[in-house]
Swiss-Prot record:
Keywords: Cytoplasm, Glycolysis, Lyase, Magnesium, Metal-binding, Secreted. NCBIfam families: eno (TIGR01060). Catalyzes the reversible conversion of 2-phosphoglycerate (2-PG) into phosphoenolpyruvate (PEP). It is essential for the degradation of carbohydrates via glycolysis. This is Enolase. It comes from Chlamydia felis (strain Fe/C-56) (Chlamydophila felis). The active site is at E207, K335.
Length: 424
């Protein structure tokens, strides 16, 4: 193995797309090459996610500073990975996990560990003169993912009364990422005009989608279908719909109800929406610990649409394995900062793929200009990606990166939607 060692790590506190602090990390090798990473942050988080370390010092950034995590990068993690071969990703990650010593990385912070993990991999890629996706995935990484584009924001991503968090479109009729982006942009701008015509607000939420005051989830879906049609596309054939319910955010753990409704009623609501709209994917339709609800949802809809677990799995290989053994869901959302290292992210994806579950690489609501997830989606051939709407530069950066990768790959690149229920 080529020997190039980690010589230094630089880090600083920066701001994410919501104006809250996060970490920037730069890993430098003794060959003079380097890699950089900015760590994202979520708003609706699963209770079993790896811990994002915050300062809780109310005199700075309303307690959301990350100076403790920053200090851990410089004073704790740098000394233990300094001198380690930059190409030994598994060793780098395992050293950091061992240094933390907790199941959820609460001692040093998943944000500190992930920043180094990703920046180290990028430094390795730079040392070899390879694109990041090629270094991570190897010569068989060539699939451009179908995007899930969050055009209407609700839930914890917007203050507009909508129960569900994300109302998305999927350009399943596209033949390239370039065409998929164009289709999404057309629908986005058509939707904006429709909202203006109805005197509805066109301000956007955390992920760049519109956040109008609407009366129901159905009204949001009606608007999306109309926008698709007025853009000249066929709903369900060229562009399908997808939901992220983020059901844990409106689940009462004491009464075990969803705003007064049982899990059976919640599943009925979702099944009815699937009957009335061209929905082929639902994420977090039930709360993360409502296992009876998940079992029923998968039994009722698992043969018809993609059932995605986010909070259910939190990119944790152990939880994914448990869910697969119980037959819960049929797809896994992948967020590297939920687990905290590139190695564990890879393990989660490979486990899901080996068991026939699809995967979707995903951003967080608090993002930066970092485009890592675009490369990872191609590296792991996930075939699907969630990276927000067609506005806000931290979202657009990922689409622009995907189009650049597509151009680099040329005829080898394959735009492929991994959702087996697309267009049904």
């Amino acid at each position: 193995m080529l020997e190039v060692a980690i010589s230094d790590i630089q880090a600083r506190e920066i701001l994410d797309s919501r104006g809250y602090p996060t970490l920037y990390v730069k890993v430098i090798t003794d060959a003079g090459t380097f890699g950089e990473a900015c760590v994202p942050s979520g708003a609706s988080t699963g209770i079993k996610e790896a811990l994002e370390l915050r300062d809780h010092d109310t005199s700075r950034y309303q307690g959301k500073g990350v100076l403790q995590a920053l200090n851990n990068v410089k004073e704790v993690l740098l000394p233990v990975v300094q001198g380690v071969n930059i190409f030994d990703q598994i060793l780098i990650d395992s050293i950091m996990v061992e240094a933390d010593g907790t199941p959820n990385k609460e001692k040093l912070g998943a944000n500190a560990i992930l920043g180094i993990s990703l920046a180290a991999a990028k430094a390795a890629a730079a040392t070899l003169g390879q694109p990041f996706y090629r270094y991570v995935g190897g010569c068989f990484s060539h699939v451009l993912p179908c995007p899930m584009m969050n055009l209407i924001n609700g839930g914890m991503h917007a203050n507009n009364g909508l129960q569900f968090q994300e109302f998305m479109i999927r350009p399943i009729g596209a033949t390239s990422i370039k065409e998929a982006v164009r289709m999404g942009a057309d629908v986005f701008h058509t939707l904006k005009k429709l909202l203006n015509d109805k005197n509805l607000a066109t301000g956007v939420g955390d992920e760049g989608g519109f956040a109008p005051q609407l009366k129901s989830n159905s009204e949001a879906l009606d608007l999306l279908v109309l926008a698709i049609e007025k853009s000249g596309f066929q709903p369900g054939k060229e562009i399908s719909l997808a939901l992220d319910c983020a059901a844990s955010s409106f689940y009462d753990t004491k009464t075990k109800t969803y705003e007064g409704k049982s899990y059976q009623e919640q599943v009925e609501i979702l099944a009815d929406l699937c009957d009335r709209y061209p929905i082929d994917s639902i994420e977090d339709g039930l709360a993360e610990e409502d296992f009876d609800g998940w079992d029923l949802l998968t039994a009722e809809l698992g043969d018809a649409i993609q059932i995605v677990g986010d909070d259910l799995f939190v990119t944790n290989p152990e939880l994914i394995a448990e869910g697969i053994s119980k037959g819960r869901a049929n797809a896994v959302l992948i967020k590297p900062n939920q687990i905290g290292t590139l190695t564990e992210t890879s393990e989660a994806i490979q486990l899901a793929h080996n068991q026939g579950y699809t995967t979707i690489l995903s951003h967080r609501s608090g993002e930066t200009e970092d485009t890592t997830i675009a490369d990872l989606a191609v590296a792991f051939n996930t075939g699907q990606i969630k990276t927000g709407s067609l506005s806000r530069s931290e979202r657009i950066a990922k689409y622009n990166r995907l189009m650049a990768i597509e151009e680099e790959l040329g005829p080898v690149g394959l735009f492929k939607d991994s959702n087996p229920f697309s267009g049904e």
